[in-house]
Amino acid sequence: MVAPTALKKSDVSEGTVPVTTTSRIVGVDNTEKIDEDDDDADVLIDQDGDAMLVDEENNEESNKKKEDAGVVLDAEGKPRFTSAASSAQTKVKLESRKVSVPPHRMTPLKNNWSKIYPPLVDHLKLQVRMNLKTKSVELRTHPKHTTDPGALQKGADFIKAFTLGFDLDDSIALLRLDDLYIETFEIKDVKTLQGDHLSRAIGRIAGKDGKTKFAIENATRTRIVLADSKIHILGGFTHIRMARESVVSLILGSPPGKVYGNLRTVASRLKERY
């Protein structure tokens, strides 16, 4: 007698056993037939590839979570940081800066103080005070109000420009424009001069009633301060270079007429550029 669990070949062919075409593994389509001649390695490779994709997605999610928590190293061992815009640290830390004021600039600072502190307080959101005991201007950021990380440096540059001898309006330009710089050099850096020779060099740079200095400023769109043997130039990078070349040529002994001719050429080039 045949065992009741055994099935005859004819029974299977006649369809007595139901055959399901859908797979019990959710998400994978197993309805396609695979030939017997096909290699099983291809199937294993595809499964490995799907597993690798899932692992990469999981790694990316874990890396994002780690980036939010702290520093994460990439495959090369370099740290990965989130962008500053997406980070929640928009507040500026409490920092302070002290700018010393020369004795000969204390009186102009006191007279113009009512015009100096409003740009720092209203525009840069800084806390400012003038310390008469130490003869300095103290700047401090406020964590609740200061939003620009470079506000403290801009304020210090503004006060420093005023203490060097620049006009108040020219110094305020440092707060409004980001591409302005101050370059300082001495006459002895160009040529070693002493006594009357040094005085004549300073006079050649200034000119009669300051005409030569004004001509250089207007042609190169800069501002120049002659503080004894020191020369301070305020302006853009290329403009400072043009003004410095004119001043250096005067120190080295070039005739003022030749310098004026070069300034005309420089002014025409600037007009064509802008």
From Swiss-Prot:
<keyword id="KW-0539">Nucleus</keyword>
<dbReference type="GO" id="GO:0005737">
    <property type="term" value="C:cytoplasm"/>
</dbReference>
<dbReference type="GO" id="GO:0005730">
    <property type="term" value="C:nucleolus"/>
</dbReference>
<feature type="domain" description="KH">
    <location>
        <begin position="195"/>
        <end position="247"/>
    </location>
</feature>
<dbReference type="InterPro" id="IPR036612">
    <property type="entry name" value="KH_dom_type_1_sf"/>
</dbReference>
<keyword id="KW-0690">Ribosome biogenesis</keyword>
<feature type="region of interest" description="Disordered">
    <location>
        <begin position="1"/>
        <end position="39"/>
    </location>
</feature>
<keyword id="KW-0694">RNA-binding</keyword>
<protein>
    <recommendedName>
        <fullName>Pre-rRNA-processing protein PNO1</fullName>
    </recommendedName>
</protein>
<comment type="similarity">
    <text>Belongs to the PNO1 family.</text>
</comment>
<dbReference type="GO" id="GO:0042254">
    <property type="term" value="P:ribosome biogenesis"/>
</dbReference>
<dbReference type="InterPro" id="IPR055212">
    <property type="entry name" value="KH-I_PNO1_first"/>
</dbReference>
<keyword id="KW-0963">Cytoplasm</keyword>
<comment type="function">
    <text>Required for small ribosomal subunit (SSU) synthesis. Has a role in the processing of early nucleolar and late cytoplasmic pre-RNA species.</text>
</comment>
<dbReference type="InterPro" id="IPR055211">
    <property type="entry name" value="KH_PNO1_2nd"/>
</dbReference>
<dbReference type="GO" id="GO:0003723">
    <property type="term" value="F:RNA binding"/>
</dbReference>
<comment type="subunit">
    <text>Component of the small ribosomal subunit, ribosomal RNA processing complex (SSU RRP complex).</text>
</comment>
<dbReference type="Pfam" id="PF22891">
    <property type="entry name" value="KH_PNO1_2nd"/>
</dbReference>
